[in-house]
Design a protein with these regions (language model features):
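Active-site microenvironments in enzyme catalytic cores
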Residues: 4-6, 38, 42-199
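Gly/serine-rich nucleotide phosphate-binding loop at the start of the catalytic core
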Residues: 2-51
């Protein structure tokens, strides 16, 4: 199921379900996917089930929403300082020459590795544990808070100090930490990330 956050023709924020043909049906009583996720947790049901029950006949199209730049990011916290953009090197194994040089050195004696490379190796070796086993916390990176996330079609501004600025397509996992500190997966989205592999 594909869901989006968008601005309706009347200017109001909406959540919509996108069909295979690009038709967007508005979800009744939902203005953000964050609200939907919280409600589904409280009701102990899947977001999909809630959407199926509340999909309306009010329609829009993806083509029009994109052409008129009415699309929002798929998920956001109402307080951007409570939203974290981060990742792990384990999902970027071949994204940069720096990773390739790390792989070449992994066969060395662990005592000769830098702390960063040790963490990378620990993550490779034990970062994806079997069910009910505790794994190694993988190497990870922090990109910023919710203020760093831009809506689709929004301008990406490159810093003046960039050495090799560029964009990378990313597959993003969207997670929410609930009131009991349980991590809940909301879904996945495509993203366009600014990166600088030289700096």
């Amino acid at each position: 199921m594909r869901i989006i956050q968008f601005r309706g023709r009347d200017g109001a924020r909406r959540v919509g379900r996108v069909s295979d043909g690009g038709i967007v049906h508005t979800i009744r009583g939902a203005t953000t996917t964050y609200e939907l996720a919280l409600e589904s947790i409280k009701k102990r049901t899947l977001i999909k089930n809630m959407i199926d029950e509340r999909v309306t006949e009010e329609k829009d199209t993806m083509d029009q929403i994109l052409a008129e730049k009415r699309i929002y990011v798929p998920f956001h916290h109402p307080n951007p300082y409570h939203q974290m953009v981060s990742g792990t090197g384990l999902s970027h194994l071949g994204s940069a020459s720096a990773r390739n040089s790390m792989h070449a050195k992994l066969d060395q004696d662990e005592a000769s590795l830098t702390d960063s490379m040790k963490m990378f190796k620990w993550g490779l070796d034990g970062g994806k544990p079997k069910t009910a086993e505790i794994g190694t916390q993988a190497e990870w990176f922090y990109k910023g808070d919710g203020d760093w996330v831009k809506d689709p079609e929004a301008e990406l501004i490159w810093p003046t100090y960039a050495l090799d600025g560029g964009e990378e397509v990313e597959l993003v996992g969207i997670y929410l930490i609930d009131e009991t500190s349980t991590v809940r997966r909301v879904g996945y989205a495509l993203a366009n990330e600014y990166a600088d592999h030289v700096m």
